[in-house]
Design a protein with these regions (language model features):
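Cleavable N-terminal export/targeting peptides
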Residues: 1-35
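Transmembrane beta-barrel domains of Gram-negative outer membranes and organellar outer membranes
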Residues: 25-288
């Protein structure tokens, strides 16, 4: 019953989102929602139009409702399901700025003696320093500031809050594009116990046809301090993202802002040290 309630939450939010977007489309051009959406469209028109990858946080500014599901297999061959995976609502409230309001993931364990529960609340802010669409330089540079609050229960979260500053860049050539992010996790307290993590993710994408985006990611974490001091883990992540499929059209048949994007892939461990062996990643999004 608990899992069913968790899965129903994104569906309820999505239904409310569809109603809001429909109201915006039916309202006049001078309404608040219409002006807001026009500003968002202008902001996104000044950047590349690649699809958001499976794992890497895109340097592009996006406005969407997103939910992910991850099944990890740990070194003891036990499965861990992570429902929603800390995704949620992404908004572009101002020019060059995106804010992400994420719901805490629900973590379910195969092991009977390990308690299931919600993880930590996370948040993220983006500022786009530079953006150029496909008709010009087809490139982007963005800074992130992420963070987490220790709201997790039953050992499914951290003991302390943390901040994660990140720099993200991307460059495209016709149907091919590369993006990379580099950042570090900085505990607000208890740094000696938690240590620090350097996160480096890169992705190569190819736009095959109208909706298909095959990709290959490299996701790396380097540990400094704590019990894993000096260790590193790296995953290769092949995947496929399909989108954006338009769900609305205007009177002239032009696609509206509301769309559907979904995809799947698998993280495959490349290093001897790893906190989990591999993971299946599923994503669903409603850009609006």
């Amino acid at each position: 019953m608990r899992i069913r309630s968790i899965l129903a939450l994104p569906a309820s939010i999505a239904a409310a989102l569809v109603l809001c977007v429909s109201a915006s489309a039916q309202s006049g051009p001078s309404s608040f929602l219409a002006r807001y959406q026009a500003r968002v469209s202008a902001t996104q028109a000044a950047q590349p139009h690649w699809i958001t990858p499976l794992v890497l946080v895109t340097p592009r500014l996006e406005q969407e409702l997103r939910t992910d599901f991850v099944r990890q297999r740990n070194p003891t061959s036990q499965n861990i399901w992570i429902y929603d995976n800390g995704k949620g609502l992404e908004l572009i409230p101002f020019r060059r700025v995106e804010l992400l309001f994420n719901t805490p993931p629900f973590i379910a364990h195969d092991q009977k003696h390990v308690a299931d529960g919600f993880g930590d609340v996370t948040f993220l802010a983006k500022y786009r320093f530079y953006g150029s669409n496909e008709q010009h330089r087809n490139a982007i540079v963005t800074a992130f500031l992420g963070g987490s609050l220790p709201t997790g229960k039953s050992g499914n979260g951290s003991c302390c809050a943390s901040l994660t500053p990140t720099l993200a860049v991307g460059k495209g050539w016709r149907r091919f594009d590369l993006s990379s992010t580099a950042g570090g996790t900085l505990p607000v307290s208890n740094a000696a116990r938690l240590g620090h993590q350097i996160l480096w993710n890169s992705v190569a994408q190819y736009h095959a046809g109208r909706f298909f985006w095959p990709e290959f990611e490299i996701n790396s974490t380097f540990f400094k301090g704590s019990a894993n001091d000096g260790k590193a883990q790296t995953f290769a992540t092949p995947g496929l993202v399909i989108g954006r499929i338009p769900l609305t059209h205007d009177a002239e048949g032009k696609p509206g802002r509301l769309g559907l994007t979904f995809g799947a892939g698998e993280q495959i461990v490349l290093t001897r040290f790893h906190t989990y062996n591999h993971a299946l990643v599923f994503t669903a999004r409603l850009p609006f």
